[in-house]
């Protein structure tokens, strides 16, 4: 209800529903996205790589003014609540969150704060991350064979983010050759490295071939490797480096401190995806959503271990509640909590004064300038800024 009341927060939503409407009305997929001018103004051609995602958003907009929020969150939260009920009622342990990818998808659904094909792509990434882990860790499982199907959907719903699948698939190929490790809280058991590398390598090749099943074929790959370059990202806020004060990034780093303080063993195959996403997030803030996805399995495993240990302490203490942390673990937990409070205090004034957060209207002088320019294609705030800046220079 809160999401429905607030409405769509991302202005890119309107760009995508207009594109989806045009495709539905003309019954044809455009050779290029005529509603995006940034690449075109630089002499590049913007591929409508989110054509299917735009159609989905357009169709949902005919039903609900705020698509993807109520429906997805209700489904995933209900599934999460049901899983917890099963755990409490029948004692089904949740030590391995990869047993059910709904746990991983839950937070990604909560992170979809705007109706965009990219948000659907994040859900596809969560499913892909689950399938990659399942194929890597369970030699008998065949679920990973579904990944090429996910790649096909991904290439058509939000093909511009498909390289993230290839990057993580490559990471799992490289992790197959990791040695045995048991130091600094990181553990890894090397098992059948050649077989794992062959499986993950073959999967990467099939995924790349599956991604070609889109209206543009290999031109889609040319788009996200050549056309969608640094020049096109220069004026876009979500492609800027992330600040440490970002609440999502700070939460992930703080939770890592808590896990390390509790002396919980971390699998190297859990840590490396997190490290890669942290490095990418430091360069592009939009990767923080993927960072949260790869953090969720470790968070669930940590909480499950803590709950089991607390339960054992309570039984030994006659059923009375006892502190979960002691000594250094308790100290680092307090330090992390204090740092989180400090970060919130620092970040709160920015939220309070940020026009994008407060919904403040543009001043009258700026509105008059926009009317004088008579722009034809302005759908986001950074486009407005870039357009007026270019006009002022002229």
Which stretches of residues belong to each language-model region?
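Short hydrophobic alpha-helices at membrane interfaces in multi-pass membrane enzymes
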Residues: 134-152, 198-202, 268-275
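Membrane-interface alpha helices of multi-pass inner-membrane proteins
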Residues: 105-110, 143-160, 206-211, 275-281
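Membrane-proximal, lumen/periplasm-facing interface regions of secretory-pathway glyco-
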Residues: 314-374, 385-386
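Conserved small/polar residues in nucleotide/adenosyl-binding loops
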Residues: 387-394
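Transmembrane-helix motifs of polytopic, lipid-linked glycan transferases
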Residues: 72-92, 387
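Transmembrane catalytic cores of multi-pass membrane glycosyltransferases
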Residues: 8-12, 24-29, 159-264, 292
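Transmembrane-helix signature of polytopic, membrane-embedded enzymes
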Residues: 85-108
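Membrane-interface transmembrane helices that cradle and orient dolichyl/undecaprenyl
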Residues: 128-144, 176, 256-265
């Amino acid at each position: 209800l809160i999401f429905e009341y607030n409405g769509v927060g991302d202005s890119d939503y309107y760009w995508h529903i207009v594109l989806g409407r045009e495709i539905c009305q003309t019954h044809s997929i455009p050779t290029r996205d005529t509603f995006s001018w940034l690449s075109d103004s630089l002499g590049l051609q913007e591929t409508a790589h989110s054509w299917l995602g735009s159609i989905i958003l357009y169709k949902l907009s005919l039903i609900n003014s705020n698509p993807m929020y109520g429906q997805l969150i209700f489904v995933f939260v209900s599934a999460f609540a049901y899983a917890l009920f099963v755990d409490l009622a029948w004692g089904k342990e949740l030590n391995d969150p990869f047993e059910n990818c709904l746990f991983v998808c839950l937070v990604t659904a909560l992170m979809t704060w705007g109706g965009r094909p990219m948000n659907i792509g994040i859900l596809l990434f969560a499913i892909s991350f689950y399938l990659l882990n399942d194929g890597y860790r369970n030699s008998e499982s065949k679920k990973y064979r579904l990944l090429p199907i996910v790649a096909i959907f991904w290439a058509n719903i939000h093909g511009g983010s498909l390289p993230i699948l290839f990057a993580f698939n490559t990471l799992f190929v490289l992790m197959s050759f990791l040695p045995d490790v048991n130091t600094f809280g990181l553990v890894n058991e090397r098992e059948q490295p050649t077989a794992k590398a062959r499986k993950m390598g073959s999967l990467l090749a099939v995924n790349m071939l599956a991604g070609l099943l889109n209206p543009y074929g290999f031109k889609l790959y040319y788009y996200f490797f050549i056309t969608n370059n640094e020049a096109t990202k220069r004026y876009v806020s979500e492609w800027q480096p992330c600040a440490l004060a970002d609440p999502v990034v700070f939460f992930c780093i703080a939770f890592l401190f808590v896990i390390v303080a509790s002396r919980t063993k971390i699998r190297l195959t859990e840590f490396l995806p997190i490290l890669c996403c942290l490095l990418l997030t430091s360069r592009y803030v939009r990767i923080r959503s993927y960072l949260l996805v790869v953090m969720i399995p470790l968070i669930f495993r940590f909480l499950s271990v803590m709950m089991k240990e607390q339960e054992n302490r309570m039984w030994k203490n006659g059923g009375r509640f006892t502190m979960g942390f002691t000594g250094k673990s308790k100290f680092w937990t307090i330090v992390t909590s204090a740092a989180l409070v400090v970060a919130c205090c620092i970040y709160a004034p920015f939220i309070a004064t940020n026009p994008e957060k407060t919904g403040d209207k543009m001043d009258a002088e700026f509105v008059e300038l926009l009317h004088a320019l008579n722009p034809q294609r302005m759908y986001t705030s950074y486009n407005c800024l870039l357009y007026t800046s270019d006009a002022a220079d002229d």
